[in-house]
């Protein structure tokens, strides 16, 4: 199974929409999330639960990491888990996590269903979804509430509503929240999955993803399968970036051999932090190439 740190695109798919669930496997998204909460009306949740095992089998065959987002545990969440765990999802996401106890409760319930379904105890990862201000300011504690947590995901619409923010394509209203969330996830040692871009705008999602990557994000959630190839491309070091990283490393190491503390490359001073970042970029490019050998769909269409 691909580790969370190498998963760039996390696609939410309506849980009872059979056509969307089938098509998702061809989207190229690294993680496919059957969404049983907001994307699935209560009257259709039983149908979504019934579909889960077959959908997960098809998604695995397509090379994706399989995830599901159920409902809060004090709502329909337990019924969701009882059904979907039969399909052994790789990741269980929990919406509206506002405190560490929500994660601990999910951990206990997932362990119970792992035992009941013959799944290796502890093998199912958890993905807390941060959707309220109260959860955002406790992200470190939430991320560390269970060893199953490898990543946390930031919401956009519910968080904006909780803040009373006015939504816009430029995302300015959530800029601080996205930066704060990233810092908390890095401090906790987990992957930060950025909020989705919720407009049907290819140029917009590319700008938004590249801005997120500049901050330090390496993963982004999405609600439109057409965005998967764009996000994957933006979150993957390009050939030009790899070439520049190699030049930077060579320039810095040559300067060190001459006894100089820094180098200059393209008019910019290169010191130890930049050298380390370049090494990390090369390592990530190699890991991504190994983890995702399948070709990406054409982001510009057929």
Predicted regions located by residue number:
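Expand to "…catalyze enediolate/carbanion chemistry for C-C bond making/breaking, isomerization
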Residues: 1-302
């Amino acid at each position: 199974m691909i580790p969370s740190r190498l998963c760039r695109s996390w696609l939410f798919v309506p849980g009872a929409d059979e056509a969307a669930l089938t098509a998702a496997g061809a989207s190229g998204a690294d993680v496919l999330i059957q969404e049983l909460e907001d994307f699935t009306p209560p009257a259709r949740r039983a149908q979504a639960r019934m579909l889960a095992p077959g959908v997960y089998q098809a998604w695995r065959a397509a090379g994706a990491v399989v995830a599901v987002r159920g409902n809060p545990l004090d709502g329909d969440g337990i019924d969701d888990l009882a059904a979907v765990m039969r399909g052994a999802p790789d990741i269980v996401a929990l919406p509206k996590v506002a405190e560490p106890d929500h994660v601990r409760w999910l951990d206990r319930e997932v362990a119970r269903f792992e035992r009941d379904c013959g799944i290796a105890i502890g093998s199912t990862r958890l993905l807390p979804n941060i959707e309220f201000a109260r959860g955002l300011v406790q992200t470190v504690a939430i991320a560390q509430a269970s060893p199953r947590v490898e990543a946390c995901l930031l919401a956009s619409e519910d968080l904006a509503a909780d803040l009373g923010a006015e939504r816009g394509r430029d995302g300015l209203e959530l800029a601080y929240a996205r930066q704060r969330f990233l810092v908390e996830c890095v401090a906790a040692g987990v992957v930060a999955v950025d909020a989705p871009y919720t407009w049907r705008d290819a140029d917009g999602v590319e700008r938004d993803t590249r801005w997120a990557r500049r901050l330090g994000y390496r993963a982004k959630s999405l609600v439109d399968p057409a965005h998967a190839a764009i996000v994957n491309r933006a979150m993957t070091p390009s050939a030009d970036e790899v070439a520049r990283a190699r030049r930077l490393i060579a320039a810095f190491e040559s300067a060190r051999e001459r006894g100089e503390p820094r180098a200059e490359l393209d008019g910019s001073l290169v010191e130890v932090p930049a050298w380390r970042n370049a090494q990390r970029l090369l390592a990530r490019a190699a890991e991504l190439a190994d983890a995702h050998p399948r070709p990406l769909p054409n982001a510009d269409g057929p």
